[in-house]
Protein backbone atom coordinates (compact mmCIF):
# COMPACT_ATOMS: atom_id res chain seq x y z
CA UNK A 1 0.00 0.00 0.00
CA UNK A 2 1.68 3.27 -1.08
CA UNK A 3 0.39 5.11 2.00
CA UNK A 4 1.60 5.46 5.56
CA UNK A 5 -0.57 5.08 8.64
CA UNK A 6 -2.88 2.43 7.19
CA UNK A 7 -3.95 -0.59 9.29
CA UNK A 8 -2.93 -4.06 8.08
CA UNK A 9 -4.27 -7.35 9.44
CA UNK A 10 -2.84 -10.88 9.34
CA UNK A 11 -5.48 -13.64 9.33
CA UNK A 12 -5.05 -17.35 10.06
CA UNK A 13 -8.11 -19.58 9.58
CA UNK A 14 -10.23 -16.45 9.28
CA UNK A 15 -9.08 -15.00 12.59
CA UNK A 16 -7.01 -11.82 12.98
CA UNK A 17 -3.78 -12.87 14.73
CA UNK A 18 -1.65 -9.76 14.19
CA UNK A 19 -2.05 -6.12 13.21
CA UNK A 20 0.32 -3.34 12.20
CA UNK A 21 0.36 0.10 10.60
CA UNK A 22 2.12 0.94 7.37
CA UNK A 23 5.12 3.22 7.64
CA UNK A 24 6.03 6.11 5.40
CA UNK A 25 7.22 3.66 2.74
CA UNK A 26 3.85 1.89 2.69
CA UNK A 27 5.17 -1.29 4.31
CA UNK A 28 3.99 -2.97 7.49
CA UNK A 29 5.71 -5.64 9.59
CA UNK A 30 3.50 -8.29 11.18
CA UNK A 31 4.73 -10.67 13.88
CA UNK A 32 3.22 -14.12 14.41
CA UNK A 33 4.60 -17.30 16.00
CA UNK A 34 3.03 -20.45 14.49
CA UNK A 35 1.76 -23.03 16.96
CA UNK A 36 2.01 -26.04 14.65
CA UNK A 37 4.27 -27.47 11.97
CA UNK A 38 3.31 -27.79 8.32
CA UNK A 39 2.23 -25.44 5.55
CA UNK A 40 -0.08 -22.75 6.86
CA UNK A 41 -2.33 -20.69 4.54
CA UNK A 42 -2.72 -17.07 5.62
CA UNK A 43 -4.24 -13.82 4.40
CA UNK A 44 -3.06 -10.23 4.74
CA UNK A 45 -5.62 -7.48 4.24
CA UNK A 46 -6.22 -3.79 4.75
CA UNK A 47 -7.92 -3.16 8.09
CA UNK A 48 -11.58 -2.22 8.32
CA UNK A 49 -10.74 1.29 9.52
CA UNK A 50 -8.56 2.04 6.50
CA UNK A 51 -9.37 4.94 4.23
CA UNK A 52 -8.42 2.92 1.13
CA UNK A 53 -10.46 0.26 -0.68
CA UNK A 54 -10.40 -3.25 0.80
CA UNK A 55 -7.46 -5.22 -0.58
CA UNK A 56 -6.19 -8.63 0.48
CA UNK A 57 -3.59 -11.17 -0.58
CA UNK A 58 -3.14 -14.84 0.29
CA UNK A 59 0.00 -16.92 0.68
CA UNK A 60 1.34 -19.98 2.48
CA UNK A 61 3.74 -20.00 5.43
CA UNK A 62 6.03 -23.05 5.52
CA UNK A 63 6.71 -24.12 9.12
CA UNK A 64 9.08 -27.01 8.49
CA UNK A 65 11.59 -28.92 10.58
CA UNK A 66 14.85 -29.64 8.79
CA UNK A 67 14.57 -33.34 9.66
CA UNK A 68 11.23 -33.81 7.85
CA UNK A 69 11.60 -35.26 4.32
CA UNK A 70 10.84 -32.86 1.47
CA UNK A 71 9.64 -33.77 -2.00
CA UNK A 72 10.09 -31.33 -4.90
CA UNK A 73 7.34 -31.48 -7.52
CA UNK A 74 7.61 -29.83 -10.92
CA UNK A 75 4.26 -28.16 -11.57
CA UNK A 76 4.27 -29.39 -15.17
CA UNK A 77 4.10 -32.99 -13.90
CA UNK A 78 0.73 -32.25 -12.29
CA UNK A 79 -0.89 -31.00 -15.48
CA UNK A 80 -2.26 -32.57 -18.60
CA UNK A 81 -0.15 -31.78 -21.65
CA UNK A 82 -1.54 -28.70 -23.44
CA UNK A 83 -3.39 -29.33 -26.70
CA UNK A 84 -2.35 -25.88 -27.91
CA UNK A 85 -0.19 -22.98 -26.85
CA UNK A 86 -1.63 -21.57 -23.63
CA UNK A 87 -0.89 -20.41 -20.10
CA UNK A 88 1.15 -22.53 -17.71
CA UNK A 89 -1.46 -22.35 -14.97
CA UNK A 90 -5.06 -21.27 -14.67
CA UNK A 91 -5.66 -17.58 -15.03
CA UNK A 92 -7.88 -16.23 -12.24
CA UNK A 93 -11.52 -16.45 -13.30
CA UNK A 94 -10.68 -18.13 -16.60
CA UNK A 95 -10.62 -21.84 -15.79
CA UNK A 96 -11.40 -22.84 -19.36
CA UNK A 97 -8.17 -21.23 -20.53
CA UNK A 98 -6.05 -23.05 -17.97
CA UNK A 99 -4.44 -26.46 -17.82
CA UNK A 100 -6.28 -29.38 -16.26
CA UNK A 101 -4.64 -31.62 -13.64
CA UNK A 102 -3.51 -35.12 -14.50
CA UNK A 103 -5.86 -37.84 -13.24
CA UNK A 104 -5.15 -38.85 -9.63
CA UNK A 105 -2.38 -36.25 -9.25
CA UNK A 106 -4.03 -34.42 -6.35
CA UNK A 107 -5.00 -37.58 -4.46
CA UNK A 108 -1.64 -39.26 -5.15
CA UNK A 109 0.36 -36.30 -3.91
CA UNK A 110 -2.02 -35.92 -0.99
CA UNK A 111 -1.20 -39.44 0.19
CA UNK A 112 2.53 -38.72 0.01
CA UNK A 113 2.24 -35.51 2.02
CA UNK A 114 -0.42 -36.52 4.55
CA UNK A 115 1.98 -38.11 7.02
CA UNK A 116 5.47 -37.99 5.55
CA UNK A 117 6.63 -35.39 3.03
CA UNK A 118 6.53 -31.61 2.95
CA UNK A 119 6.02 -30.52 -0.66
CA UNK A 120 7.96 -27.91 -2.61
CA UNK A 121 6.23 -26.94 -5.86
CA UNK A 122 8.58 -25.77 -8.60
CA UNK A 123 7.17 -23.55 -11.34
CA UNK A 124 8.94 -21.80 -14.21
CA UNK A 125 8.68 -18.04 -14.46
CA UNK A 126 6.36 -16.76 -17.19
CA UNK A 127 7.22 -13.40 -18.75
CA UNK A 128 3.73 -13.23 -20.25
CA UNK A 129 2.17 -13.37 -16.77
CA UNK A 130 4.65 -10.87 -15.34
CA UNK A 131 6.43 -10.66 -12.01
CA UNK A 132 7.27 -13.82 -10.08
CA UNK A 133 4.82 -12.96 -7.30
CA UNK A 134 2.01 -13.05 -9.88
CA UNK A 135 3.26 -16.40 -11.19
CA UNK A 136 3.34 -17.70 -7.62
CA UNK A 137 -0.18 -16.39 -6.93
CA UNK A 138 -1.56 -18.07 -10.06
CA UNK A 139 0.15 -21.35 -9.19
CA UNK A 140 -1.22 -21.20 -5.64
CA UNK A 141 -4.74 -20.54 -6.95
CA UNK A 142 -4.52 -23.39 -9.46
CA UNK A 143 -3.32 -25.82 -6.78
CA UNK A 144 -6.09 -24.73 -4.44
CA UNK A 145 -8.79 -24.94 -7.12
CA UNK A 146 -7.79 -28.53 -7.91
CA UNK A 147 -7.45 -29.66 -4.26
CA UNK A 148 -3.69 -30.20 -4.14
CA UNK A 149 -1.96 -30.26 -0.74
CA UNK A 150 -0.65 -26.95 0.55
CA UNK A 151 3.08 -26.47 0.03
CA UNK A 152 5.79 -23.92 -0.65
CA UNK A 153 5.95 -22.53 -4.20
CA UNK A 154 9.32 -21.85 -5.77
CA UNK A 155 9.44 -19.78 -8.98
CA UNK A 156 12.62 -20.20 -11.03
CA UNK A 157 13.94 -18.99 -14.37
CA UNK A 158 13.60 -21.16 -17.47
CA UNK A 159 17.35 -21.83 -17.45
CA UNK A 160 17.76 -25.66 -17.34
CA UNK A 161 20.46 -25.24 -14.68
CA UNK A 162 18.30 -23.05 -12.41
CA UNK A 163 16.86 -25.80 -10.25
CA UNK A 164 20.20 -27.55 -9.80
CA UNK A 165 21.67 -24.31 -8.48
CA UNK A 166 18.70 -23.83 -6.14
CA UNK A 167 19.01 -27.44 -4.95
CA UNK A 168 22.65 -26.81 -4.03
CA UNK A 169 21.62 -23.62 -2.23
CA UNK A 170 18.92 -25.40 -0.22
CA UNK A 171 21.26 -28.22 0.78
CA UNK A 172 23.94 -25.72 1.82
CA UNK A 173 21.33 -23.98 3.99
CA UNK A 174 20.65 -27.24 5.83
CA UNK A 175 17.62 -28.57 3.92
CA UNK A 176 19.33 -31.87 3.20
CA UNK A 177 16.13 -33.93 3.52
CA UNK A 178 15.21 -32.73 0.01
CA UNK A 179 16.35 -35.93 -1.69
CA UNK A 180 13.72 -36.69 -4.31
CA UNK A 181 11.98 -34.89 -7.13
CA UNK A 182 8.94 -35.75 -9.23
CA UNK A 183 8.91 -33.97 -12.55
CA UNK A 184 8.05 -34.00 -16.22
CA UNK A 185 11.19 -32.61 -17.84
CA UNK A 186 14.58 -34.17 -18.40
CA UNK A 187 16.37 -31.11 -16.94
CA UNK A 188 14.42 -31.39 -13.68
CA UNK A 189 15.23 -35.08 -13.29
CA UNK A 190 18.89 -34.53 -14.12
CA UNK A 191 19.21 -31.88 -11.40
CA UNK A 192 18.60 -34.67 -8.85
CA UNK A 193 20.45 -37.48 -10.60
CA UNK A 194 23.61 -35.39 -11.05
CA UNK A 195 23.68 -34.99 -7.27
CA UNK A 196 23.08 -38.71 -6.64
CA UNK A 197 19.52 -38.10 -5.54
CA UNK A 198 16.31 -39.79 -6.72
CA UNK A 199 14.09 -38.61 -9.55
CA UNK A 200 10.74 -39.86 -10.81
CA UNK A 201 9.40 -38.75 -14.20
CA UNK A 202 5.65 -38.64 -14.79
CA UNK A 203 3.97 -39.21 -17.16
CA UNK A 204 6.18 -41.64 -19.07
CA UNK A 205 8.31 -39.55 -21.46
CA UNK A 206 9.02 -40.28 -25.11
CA UNK A 207 11.60 -42.94 -25.93
CA UNK A 208 15.09 -41.72 -25.07
CA UNK A 209 13.92 -38.71 -23.06
CA UNK A 210 14.35 -40.23 -19.61
CA UNK A 211 17.88 -40.05 -18.11
CA UNK A 212 19.37 -43.50 -17.53
CA UNK A 213 18.89 -43.64 -13.75
CA UNK A 214 15.54 -41.87 -13.59
CA UNK A 215 12.52 -43.84 -12.40
CA UNK A 216 9.53 -43.61 -14.73
CA UNK A 217 5.86 -43.64 -13.71
CA UNK A 218 3.16 -43.97 -16.33
CA UNK A 219 0.74 -41.93 -14.21
CA UNK A 220 0.31 -40.54 -10.69
CA UNK A 221 -1.12 -43.81 -9.38
CA UNK A 222 2.23 -45.33 -10.27
CA UNK A 223 4.37 -42.62 -8.61
CA UNK A 224 4.17 -44.00 -5.06
CA UNK A 225 5.39 -47.40 -6.27
CA UNK A 226 8.56 -45.77 -7.61
CA UNK A 227 9.53 -44.05 -4.35
Where are these regions (language model features)?
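Beta-strand-enriched, solvent-exposed domains that form extended recognition/catalytic surfaces
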Residues: 1-67
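Conserved, compact domain cores that house catalytic/ligand-binding motifs in diverse enzymes
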Residues: 65-160
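A generic short-segment signal for beta-strand/edge and adjacent turn/coil regions
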Residues: 39-42, 88-91, 170
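Alpha-helix boundary/interfacial micro-motifs
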Residues: 42, 93-94, 201-202
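General structural signal for secondary-structure boundaries
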Residues: 4, 78-80, 218-219, 225
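C-terminal cap/substrate-recognition subdomain and adjoining C-terminal extension
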Residues: 131-227
